[in-house]
Amino acid sequence: MQERHTEQDYRALLIADTPIIDVRAPIEFEQGAMPAAINLPLMNNDERAAVGICYKQQGSDAALALGHKLVAGEIRQQRMDAWRAACLQNPHGILCCARGGQRSHIVQRWLHDAGIDYPLVEGGYKALRQTAIQATIELAQKPIVLIGGCTGSGKTLLVQQQPNGVDLEGLARHRGSAFGRTLQPQLSQASFENMLAAEMLKTDAHQDLRLWVLEDESRMIGSNHLPECLRERMTQATIAVVEDPFEIRLERLNEEYFLRMHHDFTHAYGDEQGWQEYCEYLHHGLSAIKRRLGLQRYNELAARLDAALTTQLTTGSTDGHLAWLVPLLEEYYDPMYRYQLEKKAEKVVFRGEWAGSGGMG
């Protein structure tokens, strides 16, 4: 049965988006997983914990015996059915456990006995993780051009349109501001870094890449932070600043934060609950910057937000949101970004409008 041994093999797995049947326990998978992995555990969290305690107290033979006792009969059959279905659905996939140890070998042997030969990652998730970390360190050494600009400048869409662009916010599932959350929960830090490494590897492999195009991000994107090796290189990068007219920016923000988010919430939760989730999302974003706005200004803008939501609910129009969005941009977001940009003015190599429409920076 074929097994993968070298780092080049591991990189090839990530570049090809090879389906990975990850047989670790759910708690391990949630802490960090590869982008194309599905979690079909040999043992659930409780079973894994019990086997771990047994191993410490009685040794490996007793732990192995307990594992076979816990995963037997109907439980084993149910898991075999799931693995078999996954193998048939992903004939070019691969098995993976923590370190390429007993769990993936046991599942591989059981599948072999059932007539399915399926390869495994010899070094397990740990080897793939180390490959991802090393790849990011190496690829981050290439020159970087950052796309900067005030909120609503279309930076993210501009990055997405570049063949050498990597959408950091898309990978983080967060748009990087107080209002940046999406309906997708953010991944663990390790999973985010693995996603980033895989995306950089794929982008680099599919073209003669000489430099990266990234959005000018802070260290944190929601709850995820950029790998230090990449963040350090970004501090040295040149910057192209998009300076679109204020009205164009407002159109983008209206589309992204009001029209699209309202649509996404109602699509996910239904009209009534979706509306409540949408209202809470906007209020939570404004509340997150209450201290910086000051209590009096926050209360004024929150009242305008409530009025805008009432208008939107009764008429469908989002125009009322301009009453709080415009001062929020003019008094908070724009001055903050311009202050940050002034500190790295010597790195700016371009300023000007971008003709793109839609999207959100």
UniProtKB/Swiss-Prot annotation:
InterPro entries: Rhodanese-like_dom, Rhodanese-like_dom_sf, SelU. It catalyses: 5-methylaminomethyl-2-thiouridine(34) in tRNA + selenophosphate + (2E)-geranyl diphosphate + H2O + H(+) = 5-methylaminomethyl-2-selenouridine(34) in tRNA + (2E)-thiogeraniol + phosphate + diphosphate; 5-methylaminomethyl-2-thiouridine(34) in tRNA + (2E)-geranyl diphosphate = 5-methylaminomethyl-S-(2E)-geranyl-thiouridine(34) in tRNA + diphosphate; 5-methylaminomethyl-S-(2E)-geranyl-thiouridine(34) in tRNA + selenophosphate + H(+) = 5-methylaminomethyl-2-(Se-phospho)selenouridine(34) in tRNA + (2E)-thiogeraniol; 5-methylaminomethyl-2-(Se-phospho)selenouridine(34) in tRNA + H2O = 5-methylaminomethyl-2-selenouridine(34) in tRNA + phosphate. Its EC number is 2.9.1.3. PROSITE patterns: RHODANESE_3 (PS50206). The keyword Transferase applies. The keyword Membrane does not apply. Residues 14-137 form the Rhodanese domain. It comes from the Bacteria. Monomer. Involved in the post-transcriptional modification of the uridine at the wobble position (U34) of tRNA(Lys), tRNA(Glu) and tRNA(Gln). Catalyzes the conversion of 2-thiouridine (S2U-RNA) to 2-selenouridine (Se2U-RNA). Acts in a two-step process involving geranylation of 2-thiouridine (S2U) to S-geranyl-2-thiouridine (geS2U) and subsequent selenation of the latter derivative to 2-selenouridine (Se2U) in the tRNA chain. This is tRNA 2-selenouridine synthase. It comes from Escherichia coli O6:H1 (strain CFT073 / ATCC 700928 / UPEC). The gene is selU.
